[in-house]
Amino acid sequence: MAELAKSAVLVSSCTDDLLGDAKQVVVGPNQEDLHSAEAVLNRYSTVGFQASNLARAFSICEMMLTPQSPSPSLMPTEGDQASESPVMVQPTLFVGVTANLFGTGCREAIRFLCTECVPLPNGVEPATPLDDMAGISCDGTGALKPSPCDSRALIHVLVVSGGAMEHDIRRACESYKLSRDGAEEEGEQFHHPVERDRSRSKGTDCHFGNVRYNSSGVASRNLFSCVMRCLVKRLAEAQRKEKANREAAPIPEAYYDVCSWAITPSTLWYMAGLWMADIFTEALQETGEVTDEKVASEEGLKRAKSTVLYWAARNGVPIFSPSLTDGDIMEFILTAGDTGVPLLQLDLVADIHRLNRLAMRSRRTGMMILGGGVVKHHVCNANLMRNGADYAVFLNNAQEFDGSDAGARPGEAVSWGKLRLDSTAVKVYSEVTIVFPLIVVHVFVAWVRMMRSKGKENIRS
């Protein structure tokens, strides 16, 4: 018994082979590094704890921007005719974002990712061939069009939860404000339900965390409500035209889709992006904020350009919203019927098929998930359809002890097949607003500058 206890307690330290990659010495920024924020970030890999995980996220995001060969399972086998020179592809980058983050400064960082376009280097192909899925298609009469899925931006697919794009639009209508701390400002605590009800009836600000914005109902004549009503009205009219076109066309031999004119969330937000400048112009005049038509047009374009929607539509970034019905837009869709506007027919399933197909057709993929829940699950599940993503960066502060989707670590995604066995992934335990802007400026902004600098050098030579 004594020998058994001795052998259990006095175990030799593990060898270097068992330590794996645990060979870096822990060291922080030196005195010179402390004079530069960039130098400090460059030292994060050896700081330890979540700083080292953030440094790993930097590295993985750089990999996702780097042209490389397709995933091994998708490369030609011995029986196939392999090309003389291997194909190089730009990984398809799926980004999942929870709605609340669009109410924070992360929105501007996401807009940057949808706005900046850098041409692919010579000989490099997009990881995903052009989307040839049959969808809603119409002539130039103002009817519906599916989002093109041919992104020229830094990211290629954006998946959001319900309410995200409403925050995007609302912030182009009005400013969100920061409260001093947490949920309530000093002196604004409502200890009685009646006081809360009275406050809400007077239009007290809504809040999430320490972010506040003005609450308004569907019938309100403020700018946001006017924009949303105008959007729903345009969508209903476009759907009416699409339905008429479909009814007038001959019935195909294989007639499976009896509601082919239904609108998917990705189509809805794509059309919103295309119309955004005109909708703002119309709403500004309707509310009386601007009376001069030219000034309204200029202001409408300015506000449209401040949105993620505008740039995503302009640069071919599809926006999928699996939980669209959880957002503010549903209130405007449902109440539009009271004014004689036909209720929109929505199809959420077609978008799931399309999202999954985009992943399946991608020759190499990466995921960057901000938060958890529905966006994380749908992006990961889409990549499951291709035997897993090649890269992943998860940013959230959820724990795995309760089996939640948000709390799951990369190893759990590997067990499901959502990450490849040879994938490179990291989870950074942090509140997203702290680390995401750092990733954008340290990796994506730096990459854009580097590529444009190379482009100028090529022009000179």
Curated annotation (Swiss-Prot):
Function (record text): In association with the non-catalytic regulatory subunit DHSp, catalyzes the NAD-dependent oxidative cleavage of spermidine and the subsequent transfer of the butylamine moiety of spermidine to the epsilon-amino group of a specific lysine residue of the eIF5A precursor protein to form the intermediate deoxyhypusine residue. Regulates protein levels of its regulatory subunit DHSp. Required for cell growth and survival.
Residues binding spermidine, per UniProt: 166-167, 331, 377, 403-405, 412-418
Active site: 418
InterPro entries tied to this protein: Deoxyhypusine_synthase, Deoxyhypusine_synthase_sf, DHS-like_NAD/FAD-binding_dom
Transmembrane feature ranges: 428-448
Molecular function terms, GO-annotated: deoxyhypusine synthase activity; protein homodimerization activity
Topology of the protein relative to the lipid bilayer: Single-pass membrane protein
Cofactor remark from the record: The binding sites for NAD(+) are contained in the regulatory subunit DHSp.
Subunit-structure text: Heterotetramer formed by a homodimer of the non-catalytic regulatory subunit DHSp and a homodimer of the catalytic subunit DHSc where DHSc appears to bind spermidine and DHSp appears to bind NAD(+).
Record GO biological process: peptidyl-lysine modification to peptidyl-hypusine; protein heterotetramerization; regulation of cytoplasmic translation; spermidine metabolic process
EC nos: 2.5.1.46
Phenotype on disruption: RNAi-mediated knockdown causes cell growth arrest followed by death, loss of DHSp expression and a failure to sustain infection in mice.
Protein name from the UniProt record: Deoxyhypusine synthase
Stated family: Belongs to the deoxyhypusine synthase family.
Regulation: Allosterically activated by DHSp. Inhibited by spermididine analog N1-guanyl-1,7-diamineoheptane (GC7).
Species the sequence originates in: Trypanosoma brucei brucei (strain 927/4 GUTat10.1)
EC top class, as a word: transferase
Localisation per UniProt entry: Membrane
Obligatory cofactor(s): NAD(+)
Cystine pairings recorded for this chain: none
Keywords from the UniProt entry: Hypusine biosynthesis, Membrane, NAD, Signal-anchor, Transferase, Transmembrane, Transmembrane helix
